[in-house]
C-alpha cells in the first residue's frame, strides 16, 4: 500500500471512530417504567408527569416508556427487575418494598396517619428522608413518595358495622407482615394473596373480603362481587417511586437531575389525583348500589396497639414513629 493509500485508510478509521462516538453520545436513553394500575388511575397519571418532565428537561435525550396493568410483572417482580436491569422505574406499594427494605415497615402500621396532610408531611419531612437513605443502602433510589389511598374494607356477604362483624372472616391482605398482623388483631383471618387473583377469589368465596382504596375498589370493579364497603380508613398506604441506585448512578448528571425533579413533580400529581379520586368516588359507588357503612374506628384502634408492640421495637423505628406522631 502506497503512502497515499495509508493516509486515506487512517482518515477513514478516524472518521469512523468520530461517527461512532457521535452516535453513542447522541443515543437516546430508554427507561422502562412499570406499575400494576389501570391507565386511568393516579399511578399512571404520576408516571406520565415523570415522563413529561424528564423528556423535556433532557431535550429528548431520555425516553420513558410506561407499562401499566402489570405488563412487566407483579410489584414484587418489578422490584426484582430493578435489580436485574429488566425494569428501570416502578412504584410499588410500600408494603411490598418492605420485604427488601425492612426499615420501611414503619409506614405500614395501622392508623399511623391522622389524615392526608399528616401523611404527606411524614413522607416529605425527616422521617421520609431517613427512610430514603435506608432505601439507598439497599440499592434503591427514591424519586418520590406516592400514595396508594386511604384503605377501607370490602365484604361479599355481610356489612361491617363494628369490629365484631369482621371476626372470623377471611380477609385478603398484601403479604405485608404489619398488614397481616393488623387484620389478625382485628379478629379476622388475614389471607395474603396476589392482587391479580383477588376478583376471582371474592367471586368464588375463597375469601370473604379484602382491603382497598375507593379508587381501586372502583377501577377493578370489586363492587360487583363484594358490594359491602366499610369506610374505616384503617391505614393510608404509601407507595415508593423508585429505580435501581446502580442504574441511577450510571446515568449522566443532567439525567439524574431531571429524574429527581420529575420525581417530585410526579408525586405531586399522583397524590392530587388520588385525593380527588377518593373524594369523588363514594357517591358514584353508592349510585351503583354499593352498601356503604361507617364503622366506629375505636375498636379497631384499640386492637392495633398490639401491632405497634410487635413491630416498633428498635430504637430507630421508635425514633421515626415519635417524629411522625409529633408532626
Language-model regions, residue ranges each:
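N-terminal secretory/targeting leader peptides
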Residues: 28-118, 126-127, 133-327
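Extended hydrophobic/Leu-rich segments
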Residues: 12-13, 166
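Intrinsic-disorder/low-complexity regions
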Residues: 1-2, 25
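Positively charged n-region of N-terminal signal peptides that target proteins for export
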Residues: 2-11
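Sec/Tat signal peptide C-region and signal peptidase I cleavage site
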Residues: 7, 22-27
Amino acid at each position: 500500500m502506497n503512502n497515499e493509500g495509508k493516509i486515506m485508510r487512517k482518515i477513514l478509521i478516524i472518521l469512523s471512530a468520530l461517527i461512532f462516538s457521535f452516535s453513542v453520545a447522541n443515543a437516546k436513553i430508554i427507561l422502562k417504567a412499570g406499575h400494576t394500575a389501570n391507565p386511568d388511575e393516579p399511578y399512571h397519571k404520576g408516571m406520565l408527569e415523570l415522563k413529561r418532565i424528564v423528556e423535556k428537561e433532557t431535550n429528548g435525550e431520555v425516553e420513558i416508556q410506561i407499562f401499566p396493568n402489570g405488563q412487566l410483572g407483579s410489584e414484587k417482580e418489578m422490584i426484582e427487575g430493578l435489580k436485574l436491569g429488566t425494569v428501570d422505574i416502578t412504584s410499588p406499594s410500600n408494603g411490598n418494598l418492605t420485604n427488601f427494605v425492612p426499615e420501611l415497615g414503619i409506614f405500614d402500621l395501622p392508623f399511623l396517619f391522622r389524615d392526608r396532610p399528616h401523611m404527606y408531611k411524614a413522607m416529605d419531612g425527616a422521617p421520609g428522608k431517613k427512610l430514603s437513605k435506608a432505601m439507598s443502602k439497599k440499592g434503591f433510589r427514591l424519586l418520590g413518595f406516592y400514595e396508594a389511598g386511604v384503605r377501607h374494607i370490602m365484604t361479599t356477604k355481610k356489612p361491617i358495622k363494628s369490629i365484631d362483624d369482621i371476626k372470623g372472616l377471611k380477609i385478603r391482605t398484601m403479604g405485608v407482615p404489619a398488614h397481616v398482623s393488623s387484620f389478625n388483631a382485628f379478629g379476622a383471618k388475614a389471607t395474603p394473596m396476589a392482587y391479580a387473583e383477588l376478583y376471582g377469589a371474592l367471586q368464588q368465596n375463597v375469601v370473604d373480603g379484602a382491603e382497598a382504596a375507593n379508587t381501586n375498589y372502583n377501577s377493578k370493579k370489586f363492587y360487583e362481587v363484594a358490594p359491602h364497603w366499610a369506610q374505616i380508613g384503617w391505614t393510608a398506604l404509601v407507595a415508593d417511586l423508585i429505580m435501581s441506585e446502580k442504574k441511577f448512578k450510571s446515568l449522566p448528571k443532567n439525567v439524574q437531575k431531571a429524574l429527581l425533579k420529575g420525581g417530585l413533580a410526579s408525586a405531586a400529581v399522583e397524590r392530587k389525583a388520588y385525593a380527588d379520586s377518593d373524594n369523588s368516588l363514594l357517591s358514584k359507588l353508592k349510585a351503583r348500589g354499593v352498601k356503604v357503612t361507617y364503622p366506629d374506628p375505636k375498636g379497631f384502634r384499640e386492637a392495633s396497639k398490639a401491632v405497634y408492640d410487635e413491630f416498633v421495637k428498635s430504637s430507630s423505628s421508635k425514633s421515626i414513629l415519635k417524629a411522625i406522631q409529633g408532626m
